[in-house]
């Protein structure tokens, strides 16, 4: 079961095909198929460009295929862009997400460039919140390497401000986070 067993699931119509079994997720350059995930929650299927509200919060959906065939990012109140696995932030800027995990690297790079254009055409400069590598409010930093993939096999520029992750995490508390211990990247 779990904490969210009765929660309504908002998911892109294309992404939902992974949950129905119509499509199987392939990783490590398509050498390995992930097991099917089944979720029995009530679902609301979303489409590219769709805007809806939940409790007065505006949510806009942008289809950015590549990492998965139906990967979406969500713009909240024109201020916050939840990018999931679309962007990977290195110390020197944003890249298209990890190449070995993409359904199509070429499509991922193309989608990232299209996302940048959509935001620029509307003069939007949201806070970018990634699924794995933090956040930034620096638009140029977020798209610095939009035409490049984050490769798990190439040396990346180290981030001297990134916390070392092999330590006792007892100090990783809400108080420490609010005190400024955790900073956005590219600022």
What are the residue ranges of the model-derived segments?
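Well-ordered beta-strand scaffold positions
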Residues: 14, 50, 57, 79-80
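Short, well-ordered coil/turn elements that cap or connect secondary structure elements
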Residues: 4-6, 54-56, 123
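Metallo-beta-lactamase
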Residues: 58-65, 69-153, 159-160
């Amino acid at each position: 079961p779990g904490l969210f067993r009765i929660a309504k699931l908002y998911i892109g119509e294309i992404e939902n095909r992974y949950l129905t079994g119509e499509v199987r997720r392939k990783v490590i350059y398509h050498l390995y198929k992930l097991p099917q995930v089944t979720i029995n929650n009530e679902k609301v299927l979303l489409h590219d460009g769709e805007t809806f509200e939940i409790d007065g919060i505006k949510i806009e959906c942008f289809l950015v295929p590549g990492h998965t065939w139906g990967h979406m990012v969500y713009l909240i109140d024109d201020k916050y862009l939840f990018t999931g696995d679309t962007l990977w932030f290195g110390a020197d800027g944003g890249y298209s997400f990890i190449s070995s995990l993409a359904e199509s690297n070429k499509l991922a790079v193309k989608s990232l460039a299209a996302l940048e254009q959509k935001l620029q055409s509307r003069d939007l400069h949201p806070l970018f919140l990634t699924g794995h590598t933090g956040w930034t409010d620096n638009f140029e930093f977020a798209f610095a390497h939009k035409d490049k993939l984050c490769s798990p096999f190439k040396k990346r520029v180290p981030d001297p401000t990134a916390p070392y992750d092999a330590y006792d995490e007892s100090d990783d508390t809400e108080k420490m986070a609010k005190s400024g211990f955790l900073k956005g990247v590219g600022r």
